Amino acid sequence: METIAKHRHARSSAQKVRLVADLIRGKKVSQALETLAYTNKKAAGLVKKVLESAIANAEHNDGADIDDLKVTKIFVDEGPSMKRIMPRAKGRADRILKRTSHITVVVSDR
């Protein structure tokens, strides 16, 4: 049974989160959590929370056994960017894009 968990508008760019997502794709859930625990990136914490949510969803909604679960799919899409202005010299201004991302984790016991 496939179970999905999503984190929308995560405050990190999709490019940075994809680096972490690639580490756990296809792994067993226990191994993926261990990998994320020792990954020294902000995105690892975001992905870990979504993975734990997917595990809880599978256990509660589908009655799945945690030991059989695998990360079948994990993908990161770009979310909306917040536009900000950085004042510069001589009355100019630069645009700052604070990027967000949508993290989706799918776990399955197959």
Swiss-Prot record:
Domain of life: Bacteria
Keyword Flavoprotein carried by entry: no
Keywords: Ribonucleoprotein, Ribosomal protein, RNA-binding, rRNA-binding
Phosphoprotein listed as a keyword: no
A Pfam family the protein falls into: Ribosomal_L22
Disulphide bonds in the chain: none
InterPro entries named among the record's database cross-references: Ribosomal_uL22, Ribosomal_uL22_bac/chlpt-type, Ribosomal_uL22_bac/org-type, Ribosomal_uL22_CS, Ribosomal_uL22_sf
Entry's Gene Ontology cellular component terms: cytosolic large ribosomal subunit
One GO process term, biological-process aspect: translation
An example molecular function term from Gene Ontology annotations: structural constituent of ribosome
Stored PANTHER family: CHLOROPLAST 50S RIBOSOMAL PROTEIN L22-RELATED, LARGE RIBOSOMAL SUBUNIT PROTEIN UL22M
Function description: This protein binds specifically to 23S rRNA; its binding is stimulated by other ribosomal proteins, e.g. L4, L17, and L20. It is important during the early stages of 50S assembly. It makes multiple contacts with different domains of the 23S rRNA in the assembled 50S subunit and ribosome.
Subunit structure: Part of the 50S ribosomal subunit.
Family under the similarity heading: Belongs to the universal ribosomal protein uL22 family.
Record protein name field: Large ribosomal subunit protein uL22
Gene source species: Yersinia enterocolitica serotype O:8 / biotype 1B (strain NCTC 13174 / 8081)
Taxonomic classification: Bacteria, Pseudomonadati, Pseudomonadota, Gammaproteobacteria, Enterobacterales
Encoding gene per record: rplV
